[in-house]
């Protein structure tokens, strides 16, 4: 399994596009961990709609480390919220 760890703080503008691009992946054996640095916008609500595991984080190393600590996957993929992946990205990478 792949653990996708996303570091966020007030990312409501970008996060939906990233999470949609993850959902649309051909590769499906993953979990999404959102390591959030106390967002005050809709970031958490958006992540909940995509069934992300939400944890307290920080920017950037604390958030990445916190995400890695709870990850269940054998592989870790760290992403920023403004990333969008083509549908075959995980299939070709993992």
Q: What are these regions, as identified by a protein language model?
A:
Residues 79, 83-89:
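Hydrophobic/aromatic residue at the end of a short beta strand that borders the catalytic acidic motif
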């Amino acid at each position: 399994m792949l653990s996708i760890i996303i570091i966020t703080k007030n990312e409501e503008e970008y996060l939906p596009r990233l999470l949609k691009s993850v959902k649309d992946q051909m590769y499906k054996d993953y979990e999404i961990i959102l390591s959030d640095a106390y967002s005050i916008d809709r970031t958490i609500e958006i992540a909940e709609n995509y069934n992300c595991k939400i944890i307290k984080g920080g920017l950037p190393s604390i958030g990445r480390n916190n995400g890695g600590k709870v990850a269940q996957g054998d592989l870790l993929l760290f992403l920023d919220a403004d990333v969008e992946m083509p549908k075959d990205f995980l299939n070709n990478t993992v």
